[in-house]
Swiss-Prot record:
Result after altering residue 74 to A: Abolished GDP hydrolysis
Domain of life: Eukaryota
Family affiliation: Belongs to the TRAFAC class dynamin-like GTPase superfamily. GB1/RHD3 GTPase family. GB1 subfamily.
Membrane topology: Lipid-anchor
Name of this protein: Guanylate-binding protein 1
Modifications after synthesis and translation: Isoprenylation is required for proper subcellular location. Phosphorylated at Ser-156 by PIM1 in absence of infection, inhibits GBP1: phosphorylation promotes interaction with 14-3-3 protein sigma (SFN), leading to GBP1 retention in the cytosol. Dephosphorylated in response to infection, liberating GBP1.
Effect of residue 76 to A: Abolished GDPase activity
Gene name of this polypeptide: GBP1
Cysteine methyl ester: residues bearing it: 589
Length: 592
């Protein structure tokens, strides 16, 4: 059942205390209760640039994230506000407001770089907010983007000869969409006398300079990083909302008191975010919900705190460990529920129980397959198989015990009157043995006619009859109407009957063993069938993701070539060839 969101305001998600980042347990608890998929929008920018105002607008509130009206930075760490998505039913909009970059009070660029990296890692849409035009100063202030190769790893164990830049070639596959918001923008949008849209202005501003000097490289590096890491880009410009003196009361002012152009620009920005920001997903198309976002936050923050680099692959594997373990328990619970509803012990035959087990097992595997992902070496599915086998054996044992109890109770009811008659000496007389045998046959017939005795019916009966052999023999020996020869013949008949019953029981035992072996093979085949289907689906999903990444890289390479940057185009071409090689291997991969 969908969880309800009752966040009346933002809460600190990642605290920044004395330069140390820590996840806030209260915020994590809120995330852990949200089961719906999440669209995560993070905003980053220099302090005192009005980031919080835009986030409050996205939340549909006038107040929430602290605006602050002095040169002092208000937001510390990363703050979170979860609200129902206004355009996507069944989705949650998660707004992440970050502390201002370049706060003079901190004097620690390291800290800013981690905040920037975390915002990128956690979001599906990354908003960079700045004042004025995109000039070199604005680009210099965005040097954090050039730090990402030193702050994030995509793979946990990159090849030994693979450097940070090569590892960063995978960033595009999981990085968010990029939105640049330009505040207090007062210039006309044009280049070479031609009017530009905000998006064209951004593309124009990201053009590279030809040249190999240090100055040229400094100019090009942030632009190259933005183009390479964030292929999907959008730009919005905002006029100054009010006169500078009224900015301090911005959250108290009505829209009618603001510049109409600004009001429309904010509305356009919000509309774009609501309609175009995608659901946060992980490799394999896994949609992020509250518990998954909670796990990502913990994994990344713990990595930073311990001096490691946040790693996308490690974060996904840590999440998979948690979810796959839960998937095993969910599958077992489903199996137990189904067996509890369907099975009535004792079953008439072992096969009846095994058929019910097979149906419930198939459903349990389906539950696991739906709920699991990244099950490296299929360890969790093997664990599920072992637990299901144990559950099956437990049911077989319970079935056996239920049958034994039922049959023992029946024997007591059916045969106790005969035992009482024997004790009373009714059969200790001439011709008594034949009467006894006839009565015994009648009672055995009555026993066989009783329903739902289960799989122990014959064994329990034969054990009972064997325990009464001395009583039967005593009646035989005292019957004076029988000759010694007739007694010998009768003894042999009883022995033969007993031997025949034993042989029948042995046959039955062998048949049960064969049925159990057949069931084990069927279980193995069912696991293999569903696993094969899942692996094929995962392969197709990964190929789709790689094809999307390939298209974006080809587009960027073509643009670099068009602009005349041969060296950068060659680097991109190498990345493309590496990706195409991986895709060819993936396409050729067959599951045997």
């Amino acid at each position: 059942m969908a969880s309800e969101i009752h966040m009346t305001g933002p809460m600190c998600l990642i605290e920044n205390t004395n330069g140390r980042l820590m996840a806030n347990p209260e915020a994590l608890k809120i995330l852990s209760a949200i089961t719906q998929p999440m669209v995560v929008v993070a905003i980053v920018g220099l302090y005192r640039t009005g980031k919080s105002y835009l986030m409050n607008k996205l939340a549909g509130k006038k107040k929430g994230f602290s605006l602050g009206s002095t040169v002092q930075s208000h937001t510390k760490g990363i703050w979170m506000w979860c609200v129902p998505h206004p355009k996507k039913p069944g989705h949650i909009l998660v707004l992440l407001d970050t502390e201002g970059l370049g706060d003079v009070e901190k004097g620690d660029n390291q800290n800013d770089s981690w905040i920037f990296a975390l915002a990128v890692l956690l979001s599906s849409t990354f908003v960079y907010n700045s004042i004025g035009t995109i000039n070199q100063q604005a680009m210099d202030q965005l040097y954090y983007v050039t730090e990402l190769t030193h702050r994030i790893r995509s793979k946990s164990s990159p090849d030994e000869n693979e450097n940070e830049v090569e590892d960063s070639a995978d960033f595009v596959s999981f990085f968010p969409d990029f939105v640049w918001t330009l505040r207090d923008f007062s210039l006309d949008l044009e280049a070479d006398g031609q009017p530009l849209t905000p998006d064209e202005y951004l593309t124009y501003s990201l053009k590279l300079k030809k040249g190999t000097s240090q100055k040229d490289e400094t100019f090009n590096l942030p632009r190259l990083c933005i183009r390479k890491f964030f292929p999907k880009k959008k730009c919005f410009v905002f006029d100054r909302p009010v006169h500078r003196r009224k900015l301090a009361q911005l959250e108290k002012l009505q829209d009618e008191e603001l510049d109409p152009e600004f009001v429309q620009q904010v509305a356009d920005f919000c509309s774009y975010i609501f309609s175009n920001s995608k659901t946060k997903t992980l490799s394999g198309g896994i949609q992020v919900n509250g518990p998954r976002l909670e796990s990502l936050v913990l994994t990344y923050v713990n990595a930073i705190s311990s001096g490691d680099l946040p790693c996308m692959e490690n974060a996904v594997l840590a999440l998979a460990q948690i979810e796959n373990s839960a998937a095993v328990q969910k599958a077992i619970a489903h199996y137990e529920q189904q067996m509890g509803q369907k099975v009535q012990l004792p079953t008439e035959t072992l096969q009846e129980l095994l058929d019910l087990h097979r149906d419930s097992e198939r459903e349990a595997i389906e539950v696991f397959i739906r709920s699991s992902f990244k099950d490296v070496d299929h360890l969790f599915q093997k664990e599920l198989a072992a637990q299901l086998e144990k559950k099956r054996d437990d049911f077989c044992k319970q079935n056996q015990e239920a049958s034994s109890d039922r049959c023992s109770a029946l024997l007591q009811v059916i045969f106790s009157p005969l035992e009482e008659e024997v004790k009373a000496g009714i059969y200790s007389k001439p011709g008594g043995y034949r009467l006894f045998v006839q009565k015994l046959q009648d009672l055995k017939k009555k026993y066989y006619e009783e329903p739902r005795k289960g799989i122990q019916a014959e064994e329990i009966l034969q054990t009972y009859l064997k325990s009464k052999e001395s009583m039967t023999d005593a009646i035989l020996q005292t019957d004076q109407t029988l000759t010694e020869k007739e007694k010998e013949i009768e003894v042999e008949r009883v022995k033969a009957e007993s031997a025949q019953a034993s042989a029948k029981m042995l046959q039955e035992m062998q048949r049960k063993n064969e049925q159990m072996m057949e069931q084990k093979e069927r279980s193995y085949q069912e696991h293999l069938k569903q696993l094969t289907e899942k692996m094929e689906n995962d392969r197709v999903q990964l190929l789709k993701e790689q094809e999307r990444t390939l298209a974006l890289k080809l587009q960027e390479q073509e643009q670099l070539l068009k602009e005349g940057f041969q060296k950068e185009s060659r680097i991109m071409k190498n990345e493309i060839q590496d990706l195409q090689t991986k895709m060819r291997r993936r396409k050729a991969c067959t599951i045997s």
